[in-house]
């Protein structure tokens, strides 16, 4: 399959997806429903599904596998869009990584982050993302929140200093917020908290850091992902984006993009187009445990086709009409116009 491309998009026009998107179907209540696809073979599956970029954790493509992974990616015609250290899978991080009360664990997390940056460079990744997986608490007063902020500031300052010394200023680091799951309460729970944290970093490091918002994570927090993305854009900090769908404030469902809120998704794409977003548009989705192995890439192709359809509809939205509705204070009419653009 030829790679999907977003017509008239500035910068990167291809799409990305994670190797974890096509996993074995496990969930907290049940084991695998499919045999695992070898990790390097997943690169070919994603390429065949029309992806231009793959994403991976350091537990999926190990540091010592990076050169071989890049070679395999070149062979199948896909590039590394994003690489991320796992601060959540190893039991040592069960009560946090950079915010752990144990200084030895905090030091280990920082070393893992540094190694992930080196690995990302070998892979040719466009951005390194840090997700707050275990940063937070389940019971009150088990951590001092003020100390947690200081630890995050110190940790990311150390990571930035290492990145600049080793690789120079041409590297992008993004933080991905999420409000809960797996922890009951998570630090860096939303875009605003991440932007605040970046503002607390040393001034010489702030330009290296941005945000990787995920639409479902905003919804889990009861927030509007359109506004979250607009905050990132206004701050010049939208370094990456993860698209998916979420059916209310439940567990993180990673449903196909365009499934639950297509009108809001249409509006989001209008915002990205008008802002001239140049980064990769990627999916954080998950093949459901009910899907047959031979159809495991459906989650990727369905999301991609929904995105391309909505992208074309967003290009056709009359921006002058939007402005007229605003000027005339016809908010309901504007909503109706967008619905017409969506449904025809």
Predicted regions and their residues:
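Histidine-acidic metal/acid-base catalytic patches
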Residues: 1-50, 140-141, 154-162, 168, ...
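Glycine-rich, aromatic-flanked loop segments that form ligand/cofactor-binding clefts
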Residues: 7-20, 61, 66-87, 119-124
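Short secondary-structure capping/turn micro-motifs that flank functional sites
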Residues: 62-63, 89-90, 136-137, 249, ...
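Short loop/turn segments at strand-loop or loop-helix junctions that form parts
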Residues: 17-23, 85-87, 130-135, 175-178, ...
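Glycine-rich, proline-tolerant flexible connector loops at the mouths of alpha/beta enzymes
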Residues: 53-73, 132, 138
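Short, flexible, mixed-charge acidic loops at enzyme active sites
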Residues: 31-35, 86-95
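Active-site acidic/histidine proton-transfer and metal-coordination neighborhood
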Residues: 2-7, 74-75, 79-80, 92-210, ...
